[in-house]
Structures are given as C-alpha cells and as structure tokens.
Amino acid sequence: MYKKVLVPLDGSALAECTLSHVKNLFKDGSLGEVTLLNVVKFDFPWARMRSEQDIKHIDLDAIREPFFVKSKKYLADLESQLVSEGMKVKTESLEGNRPADTITEYAQEKGMDMIIIGTHGYTGLKKLMVGSVAFGVLHQSHIPVLLIRPESCRP
C-alpha cells in the first residue's frame, strides 16, 4: 500500500528514532522505497538582506556548501545502514527556511504515499505535544502522516 515513504530528519536522535519504526513497519518487504530528507535551513542575517548591494560581497554558495556537505554525509551514513538491511533508499538535501513547507511540497511533488516524522526533533521541546515542524506537516499534508513520539524511542 505504501510504496513511497518520506522520512524527514533533522540530525537529532529523536528524529532518527523514526528509522527504527520504518524498519519495523516494513520488515516484510512491503515498502517500495524510503526517501530520507534533510531540510537545510539558512537563517543568517545576510539571508534576509534585500538588495543586491547588500550581498554583493558575500559568496552565498561558499557559505551554503559546508551545510550541504554535512547534510549529504549525514544522510549517506543513514542510507548505508538501511540499504544493508535490504531497504531501497533515496536521500535528498533541500534548502528551506520553513521546513514544514519544504517537506509537504516535496512529498506532493514526488508522489509520496506517507510521511513518517518524529514529533520533536532538533529543538526537542518536550513540553509541547507536537513539535512545530511536525505540527506544520500534519496540518499541511494531504497524504497520511505517521507521528513518532519520543517515548516510543526509549530502549
């Protein structure tokens, strides 16, 4: 039923715990493909500069590159773990200042059947019922969203 599943990850242990759920849900081989997505967010003062004059001396590509290198390495490491367990995996690093928007747009554009996302990621604000990115994805998505709570990740 779910042939294309999107798993957004932000580098946190809580986000990565979703992978154990993906493995358990699809251990029977019913999953066609999982896509691991990392949204690289740039929220630097120069990112908000409006005029070309403001940023003409800043090489934005040189600033972005290390973030994408780190993102791609992170996803490649996770990909190799899943591939070694027999899963078909794709990875994607995308730039986006609003991760929930980037995730839902990507899911729609790529025809994903489901999104599996941790409720609390990098910020890990435990007092919130659902983290802001997961909340945004849940409310914007037109495909099923499986939320993974941090409590389900404890050994």
Residue ranges with predicted function:
Residues 77-115, 153-155:
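Structural beta-alpha unit
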Residues 2, 22, 31, 36, ...:
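Aromatic/pi-system hotspot detector in well-structured domains
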Residues 35-37, 90-94, 146:
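General small-molecule cofactor/ligand-binding pocket signal
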Residues 39-41, 96, 150:
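Active-site loop/turn elements of alpha/beta-hydrolase fold enzymes
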Residues 4, 13, 105-155:
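Gly/Ser-rich helix-loop-strand patches that form or flank binding pockets
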